A protein has these predicted regions:
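Active-site activation/catalytic loop segments of kinase-like enzymes and analogous catalytic loops
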Residues: 103-138, 151-166
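Short, polar/flexible loop-turn hinges at active-site or ligand-entry regions and domain interfaces
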Residues: 1-3, 97, 117-119
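Amphipathic alpha-helical protein-interaction segments enriched in hydrophobic
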Residues: 143-153
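Active-site acidic catalytic loop and adjacent metal/ATP-binding pocket
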Residues: 60-104
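Conserved kinase catalytic-core helix
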Residues: 1-32, 51-66, 70-79
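A glycine-centered beta->alpha junction motif in the catalytic cores
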Residues: 1-4, 22, 35-44, 152-168
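ATP/Mg2+ or Mg2+-diphosphate-binding catalytic cores
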Residues: 127, 157-189
Length: 189
């Protein structure tokens, strides 16, 4: 397992974006579908107004537009990959989606390792992205917008894999991601 971000991770996500890219109306994408599902469960979320505001921003940006999206592995973490002969192999694709903003898996890798291996709080994780903002903006255009897209995506994934009442563990994860959304909203950038 490779626990630090390396060139092989970037190459993998670049290939994934290039090989799976497709153009569609935003309203016909998996991302919009998942946002709709998340919206349907807003009343169960911590910080629902913060989530709702982020969703409105994303929808306003993409509404009625043709977008070029690609596959989102959705669980791109060191414990779901291995390297052999200089090649990265990724497994556990059960949460993958086909039409999402490209390269969101980068945020999943960074955030999950920061939470589970470094035990960092939301504000420190956001500060790490901010410190790397110029490089990330070169990749994403506006990394903060892409990070919001990722946070909404992961919230939708976690909320919708549970039926009925959200478990305490999932609620706590959602609260963590909401703190990150709030941090992005309140940042001076």
């Amino acid at each position: 397992m490779i626990h630090c971000w390396e060139a092989m991770h970037s190459c993998f996500l670049d290939r994934l974006a290039m090989q799976t890219r497709q153009t569609a109306l935003f309203e016909q994408t998996d991302f919009d579908y998942d946002l709709n599902r998340l919206e349907g469960r807003l009343s169960q979320l911590p910080g629902a107004s913060i989530v709702e505001k982020a969703m409105a921003e994303v929808r306003y940006y993409y509404a009625g537009c043709e977008v070029e999206f690609s596959a989102f592995q959705a669980d791109f973490t060191p414990w779901n990959m291995f390297e052999e002969g200089g090649e990265l192999f990724v497994f556990d694709w059960e949460y993958a989606r086909l039409t999402y903003p490209p390269r969101l898996d980068y945020f999943h890798f960074r955030i999950q390792t920061a939470i589970f291996e470094q035990h960092l709080p939301a504000d420190v994780i956001c500060a790490g992205f901010e410190a790397d903002g110029n490089r990330l903006n070169g990749i994403y255009g506006d990394y903060r917008f892409s990070l919001k897209c990722y946070l909404l995506a992961v919230m939708s994934l976690y909320v919708n894999r549970e039926s009925g009442t959200i478990s305490r563990d999932t609620y706590n994860r959602l609260a963590f991601w909401v703190k990150m959304l709030e941090q992005l909203e309140n940042s001076d950038l």
